[in-house]
């Protein structure tokens, strides 16, 4: 016998305003982070090209003649100290806060210190002055990342400086051979798209934290 009960021809419509699942929020958060990073790099590249065009951004190698040294002894000029290696260009730090100072104005993205340390140097840091400033401070301090053999790179991010102070060691009594300080060293263009250590941490964890807070906000909103 034929069943005459009414049948459902169409499925029930999906509930309007259905919240996104946590996985979807997480994907959206990371996609937004990638877009923000690309915009940041492209804007920074445009600013860099503008400074190159007007001549305020140049690549320059500073030698010992361009720099001032504080709390250093030059082995070449001191008969009481003997360099660990029989070659010129070696300095000895006389306390735990030696300084290499450059006085000048430039627009800088990165600074590279090429130096050989005969002993472990501890931390290597750079301080910078902005226009109108005369005193170095901890708020304008950049720690070095080791970018090659006897090579330390400081990422300033693109700003105008009127002076630099490099602290090549933090322990004192370290023989150091200074091979040069390079302002805005030439780098492959694609490296601009590669985040540094701190930026990697931000890109990895900030979207996850943002997605978690978004999930909590959605739950609270739909419970009301």
Predicted regions and their residues:
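N-terminal Lys/Arg-rich, disordered targeting/topogenic segments
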Residues: 1-22, 223-224
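Extracellular ligand-binding interfaces
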Residues: 73-153
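Short, conserved beta-strand segments of beta-strand-rich sandwich/propeller modules, principally
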Residues: 110, 161-163
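Short proline/glycine-enriched turn/loop motifs at strand-loop junctions of beta-rich domains
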Residues: 117-122, 159, 171-172
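Short, hydrophobic beta-strand segments
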Residues: 152-160
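Short beta-strand-plus-loop segments that form exposed binding edges in beta-rich domains
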Residues: 165-174
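Juxtamembrane interface at the cytosolic side of transmembrane helices
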Residues: 208-224
């Amino acid at each position: 016998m034929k069943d005459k009960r009414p049948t459902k021809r169409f499925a029930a419509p999906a509930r309007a305003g259905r919240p996104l699942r946590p996985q979807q929020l997480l994907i959206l958060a990371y996609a937004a982070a990638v877009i923000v990073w690309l915009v940041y790099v492209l804007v920074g590249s445009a600013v860099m090209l503008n400074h190159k065009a007007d001549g305020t951004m140049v690549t320059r190698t500073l030698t010992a003649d361009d720099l001032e040294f504080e709390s250093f002894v030059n082995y070449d000029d001191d008969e009481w100290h003997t360099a660990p290696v029989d070659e010129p260009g070696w300095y000895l730090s006389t306390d735990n806060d030696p300084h290499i100072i450059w006085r000048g104005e430039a627009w800088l993205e990165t600074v590279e210190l090429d130096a050989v340390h005969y002993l472990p140097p501890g931390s290597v840091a750079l301080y910078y002055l902005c226009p109108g400033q005369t005193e170095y401070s901890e708020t304008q301090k950049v720690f070095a990342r080791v970018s090659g053999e006897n090579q330390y790179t400081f990422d300033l991010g693109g700003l105008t400086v009127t002076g630099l102070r490099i602290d090549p060691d933090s322990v004192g009594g370290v023989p150091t051979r200074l091979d040069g300080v390079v302002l805005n060293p030439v780098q492959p263009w694609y490296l601009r798209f590669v985040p540094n250590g701190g930026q990697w941490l931000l890109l990895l964890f900030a979207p996850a934290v943002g997605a978690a807070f978004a999930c909590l906000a959605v739950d609270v909103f739909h419970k009301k």
